[in-house]
């Protein structure tokens, strides 16, 4: 037996009076350390033939003593909660071939009810009536003595509950009451059971395992001990001051939270060819910065922002800009990125600026395209009075920019000079044939003068809204000073037309009238 004790590492334990092994003998239980006044405690532990010499050693006794000095508390829940420290023992002195049943029960340590006040436990009244005791049988029972002595006997699956109607076999306890666990070693009978008169058994009690049942930890020292020693006590770490300090330090260093103002400043300071006069409202960038701030994502904010785009967004039907007012002496024609490509560059070089971002469907006819272009041009119609003269191309300056009317609170900066032409109702547009080839051909001979029954279509390229007076007496304005192929052609119309297409007008019996300039 000494070899077994030395192999377990507790050879000196039986020499100490406090850690004396609980052997099966006929001594009163009060000598074993259990309270002698406890009504539920047996007054004696009996031993019978074949049960002599059995010794039990408590595993992790030092840890149990740490909790016992402070006042051990065990959580009880309705669903059941395991004990920590776990009840584990080392058993020696069993007959290797005899079958034994190991079981536990938890009995009241006294008849008092406790409360925790002023950082200590004190008696507050008489204990509630004890529930009928339940026994927890080890799952390996029955087993031979060789099986029990081969390794530690663990009761870690035992659960404590305060549900008096518990159907799962958990040990039922009352909160704020003190309890004492007990270990019973029973020799199995011929039916591998126990309970008969001749059943041999012995009981072992370790006073340092006594505890008070609670629904939540009362002593913060017990909480700290559970956190330090129980790797599964994560549920209590969130409310611990040390854990909160650690989490705050981790958030401040490893996962910094980027302020909203910093991200917005970086969004507005992105490089753009229009940064000298306009500031684009990038909605996607603002949304990204909000998610970044709220979620606390680390890393530079520029990684989550879209790269600076040197061109306007061609896929949007309407371009949103905020134009700032500037003085005349600070403004020149070369500083306007919208005016310069119209007057100084060819359509091929600045194609990406003024081409429509969405391709026209090839199956659509020319009349459908011109109608959609006419409606798009009407969408950008201004609300200025009809009597206001339209400025010519030479008169456009910085003073005219802020004075132009806005659509949807966004100033349209690409304003083109228009020549007044007779206006007809929209019903005439829907009955006409394709007029874009005819207008393109006429542009080479000058601007034709149309009669009262004639009308003229004009297409609107993306980001080139045409200013139009929508009064009943005003005429439809068409460009005069620009190169005709750049403004009048759509994507689906060829730029070289044969002469017989010049007069392809399907009006209501109308013949075009040519001016002297033609």
From Swiss-Prot:
Region (Disordered): 1-46, 254-307, 330-352
Composition skew (Low complexity), residue ranges: 34-45
Coiled coil: none
An annotated Gene Ontology molecular function: DNA binding
Post-translational modification: Acetylation at Lys-339 by KAT2A and KAT2B promotes nuclear retention.
Biased composition (Basic and acidic residues): 15-28
PTM annotation (N6-acetyllysine): residues: 339
GO cellular component assignments: cytoplasm; nucleoplasm; nucleus; protein-containing complex; protein-DNA complex; transcription regulator complex
SUPFAM superfamilies (UniProt xref): p53-like transcription factors
GO biological process, one term: pericardium development
DNA-binding region (UniProt annotation): 58-238
Key words of the record: Acetylation, Cytoplasm, Developmental protein, DNA-binding, Nucleus, Transcription, Transcription regulation
Domain of life: Eukaryota
UniProt-annotated location(s): Nucleus; Cytoplasm
Keyword Nucleus attributed: yes
Biased composition annotated in UniProt, kind: Polar residues: 269-301
Domain comment quoted from the record: The T-Box domain binds to double-stranded DNA.
Subunit structure: Monomer. Homodimer (via the T-box); binds DNA as homodimer. Interacts (via the T-box) with NKX2-5 (via the homeobox); this complex binds DNA. Interacts with GATA4. Interacts with KAT2A and KAT2B.
Role description: DNA-binding protein that regulates the transcription of several genes and is involved in heart development and limb pattern formation. Binds to the core DNA motif of NPPA promoter.
Name of the protein: T-box transcription factor TBX5
Source organism: Mus musculus
Encoding gene per record: Tbx5
């Amino acid at each position: 037996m000494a070899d077994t004790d030395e192999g377990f590492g507790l050879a000196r334990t039986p020499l100490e009076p406090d850690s004396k092994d609980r052997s099966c003998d006929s001594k009163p239980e009060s000598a074993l350390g259990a309270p002698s006044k406890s009504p539920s405690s047996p007054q004696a532990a009996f031993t019978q033939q074949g049960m002599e010499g059995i010794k039990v050693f408590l595993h992790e006794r030092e840890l149990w003593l740490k909790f016992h000095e402070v006042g051990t508390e065990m959580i009880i829940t309705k669903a059941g909660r395991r004990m920590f420290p776990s009840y584990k023992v080392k058993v020696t002195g069993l007959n290797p071939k005899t079958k034994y049943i190991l079981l536990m029960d938890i009995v009241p340590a006294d008849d008092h009810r406790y409360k925790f006040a002023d950082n200590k436990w004190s008696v507050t009244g008489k204990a509630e009536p004890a529930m009928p005791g339940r026994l927890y049988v080890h799952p390996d029972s029955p087993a031979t003595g060789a099986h029990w002595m081969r390794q530690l006997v663990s009761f870690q699956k035992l659960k404590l509950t305060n549900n008096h109607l518990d159907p799962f076999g958990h040990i039922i306890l009352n909160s704020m009451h003190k309890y004492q666990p007990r270990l019973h070693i029973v020799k199995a009978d011929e039916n591998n059971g126990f309970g008969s008169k001749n059943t041999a058994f012995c009981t072992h009690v370790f006073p340092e395992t006594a505890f008070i049942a609670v629904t939540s930890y009362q002593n913060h020292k017990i909480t700290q001990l559970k956190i330090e020693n129980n790797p599964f006590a994560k549920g209590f770490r969130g409310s611990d001051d040390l854990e909160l300090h650690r989490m705050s330090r981790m958030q401040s260093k490893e996962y910094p939270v980027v302020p909203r103002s910093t991200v917005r400043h970086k969004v507005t300071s992105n490089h753009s060819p229009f940064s000298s006069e306009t500031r684009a409202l990038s909605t996607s960038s603002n949304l990204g910065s909000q998610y970044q701030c709220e979620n606390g994502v680390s890393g530079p904010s520029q990684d989550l922002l879209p790269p600076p785009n040197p061109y306007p967004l061609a896929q949007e039907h309407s371009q949103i800009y905020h134009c700032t007012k500037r003085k005349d002496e600070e403004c020149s024609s070369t500083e306007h990125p919208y005016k310069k490509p119209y007057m100084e560059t060819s359509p091929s070089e600045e194609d990406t600026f003024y081409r429509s971002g969405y391709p026209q469907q090839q199956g659509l006819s020319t009349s459908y395209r011109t109608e959609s272009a006419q409606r798009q041009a009407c969408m950008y119609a201004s609300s200025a009075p009809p009597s206001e003269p339209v400025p010519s191309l030479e008169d456009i300056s910085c003073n005219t920019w802020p004075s132009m009317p806005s659509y949807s609170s966004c100033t349209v900066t690409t304003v083109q000079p228009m020549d007044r032409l007779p206006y007809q109702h929209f019903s005439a547009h829907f009955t006409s044939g394709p007029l874009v080839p005819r207008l393109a051909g006429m542009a080479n001979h000058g601007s034709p003068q149309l009669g009262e029954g004639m009308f003229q279509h004009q297409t609107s390229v993306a980001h080139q809204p045409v200013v139009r007076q929508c009064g009943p007496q005003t005429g439809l304005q068409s460009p005069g000073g620009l190169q005709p192929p750049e403004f009048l052609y759509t994507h689906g119309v060829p730029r070289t037309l044969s002469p017989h297409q010049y007069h392809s007008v399907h009006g209501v019996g109308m013949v075009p009238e040519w001016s002297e300039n033609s």
